[in-house]
């Protein structure tokens, strides 16, 4: 009787290597994308305080919608990863074409909603010039939203067939383009019109269409895409396929919206305590967000690793890949937490020369160090769960964690409302909100870890 073929042996080293190869180009791309926002703020700050305020307000609306669209479009990552693992390569072109139709629709809806969101500016007591510039910033930059949504469809396609290099190269080129066109249009160099903060919006909107074009060109030209090339023929929308991807993608979008809007709400609530509190909070949050790019990139890679393993009918490897990814994220979190604890004063001084802001920022960075472990765990576990094509449960957990625990607890500690019987004697201001964020992230991490354990065990058992 012939021996049955042995299952491949999984080793931590090979899985870590595979996940790192997938993730590091995406990390470089994420950092370049973040760099565009940093460049917008830094370059506009040299024009005037009013222009900087307008760009900051406009970017806050834009970024919330951008991250939400990113989540809605993420369903293609899971679908293509499963098809790749199952070696169903002939199915992938159809999925990509439908994802592009979905991206066009999602992008147009997001463009409309982004413009409607500017109505908020009329009710928050802005100076007329700041209101007008912030609204114009949003109106212009929203024109890039359809391109961004379609780009994210192609982003999910290329990363899920293990082709992550274009993501890095195109994002870096996009950053360079953004900085150059900012220089032209913000300051009116080389005879171009001096648009101030609106010049950032023009640069970003054009840059998004160019990034979409660059990705299309790369897919058309590179040999790695020949087996799954999606542009062999025209295909009308298949509403059943698009509906299936929306069914997976909308919960991810809601999750991202809940998280980003919670952090945005904290920033607005902290604003009542004055410039020092707001500045220290924003610096600590900015640095924590920068560090978060690493576990976020591991998370996108995890969707691919887990999805491909499930596609090939190997739930044991999927579970192994998931926990190795969680362990990698935790290992990085330990290092980043140690770094923040050791260098929190240096980090604060790098951002500001104001002694009062430095002192409070160094204090808030203690909380940032504390939630590194929870934040890395929740993003890794939720991404792994999405690799199983399960998106509603992470949404429910994260909405509960941020809006059911983090914000209410933060508001009680930060604002000390008189009507609440267990409020602190004095408002803890920004520190109180950070305690709430640590609590919310920890609850999310614990519940998502339990969910991943239960889900992966059921799949291994064949249920």
Give short role names for the model-derived ranges.
Residues 35-38, 46-49, 83-86, 160-161, ...:
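Helix-loop interface residues and adjacent transmembrane-helix termini in multi-pass membrane transporters
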Residues 127, 163-164, 274, 354, ...:
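Short loop-to-helix capping motifs
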Residues 44, 184-198:
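Interfacial helix-loop-helix junctions of multi-pass membrane proteins
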Residues 1-23, 80-146, 192-250, 306-371, ...:
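Short alpha-helical transmembrane segments in multi-pass integral membrane proteins
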Residues 52-111, 115, 148-167, 280-343, ...:
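Small-residue-rich hydrophobic transmembrane alpha-helices
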């Amino acid at each position: 009787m012939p021996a049955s073929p042995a299952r491949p042996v999984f080793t931590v080293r090979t899985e870590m290597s595979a996940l790192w190869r997938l993730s590091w180009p995406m990390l470089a791309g994420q950092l370049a994308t973040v760099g565009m926002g940093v460049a917008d703020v830094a370059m506009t700050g040299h024009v005037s305080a009013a222009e900087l305020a307008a760009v900051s307000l406009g970017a806050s609306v834009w970024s919330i919608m951008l991250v939400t669209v990113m989540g809605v479009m993420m369903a293609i990552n899971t679908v293509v990863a499963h098809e790749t693992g199952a070696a169903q390569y002939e199915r992938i072109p159809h999925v990509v074409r439908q994802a592009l139709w979905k991206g066009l629709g999602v992008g147009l809806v997001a463009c409309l909603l982004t413009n409607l969101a500017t109505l908020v500016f009329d009710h928050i007591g802005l100076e007329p010039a700041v209101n007008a510039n912030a609204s114009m910033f949003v109106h212009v930059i929203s024109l890039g939203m359809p391109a961004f949504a379609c780009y994210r469809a192609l982003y999910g396609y290329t990363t899920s067939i293990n082709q992550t290099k274009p993501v890095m190269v195109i994002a870096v080129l996009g950053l360079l383009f953004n900085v150059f066109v900012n220089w032209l249009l913000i300051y009116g160099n080389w005879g171009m019109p001096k648009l101030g903060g609106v010049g950032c919006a023009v640069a970003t909107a054009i840059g998004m269409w160019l990034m979409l074009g660059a990705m299309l060109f790369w897919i058309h030209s590179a040999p790695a895409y020949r087996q799954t090339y999606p542009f062999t023929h025209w295909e009308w929308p298949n509403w059943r396929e698009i509906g299936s991807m929306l069914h997976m993608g909308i919960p991810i979008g809601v999750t991202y919206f809940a998280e980003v809007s919670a952090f945005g709400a904290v920033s607005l609530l902290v604003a009542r305590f004055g410039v020092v509190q707001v500045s220290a909070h924003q610096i600590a949050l900015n640095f924590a967000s920068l560090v978060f790019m690493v576990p976020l990139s591991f998370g996108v890679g995890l969707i691919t690793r887990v999805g491909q393993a499930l596609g090939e009918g190997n739930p044991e490897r999927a579970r192994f890949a998931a926990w190795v990814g969680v362990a990698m994220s935790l290992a990085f979190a330990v290092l980043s937490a140690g770094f923040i604890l050791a260098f929190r004063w240096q980090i604060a001084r790098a951002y500001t020369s104001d002694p009062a802001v430095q002192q409070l920022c160094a204090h808030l960075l203690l909380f940032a160090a504390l939630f590194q472990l929870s934040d890395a765990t929740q993003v890794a576990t939720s991404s792994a769960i999405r690799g199983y094509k399960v998106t509603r449960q992470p949404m429910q957990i994260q909405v509960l964690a941020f809006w059911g625990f983090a914000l209410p607890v933060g508001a009680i500690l930060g604002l000390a409302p008189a009507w609440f019987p267990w409020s602190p004697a004095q408002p803890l201001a920004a520190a109180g909100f950070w305690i709430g964020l640590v609590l919310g992230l920890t609850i999310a991490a614990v519940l998502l870890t339990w969910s991943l354990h239960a889900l992966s065990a059921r799949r291994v058992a064949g249920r």
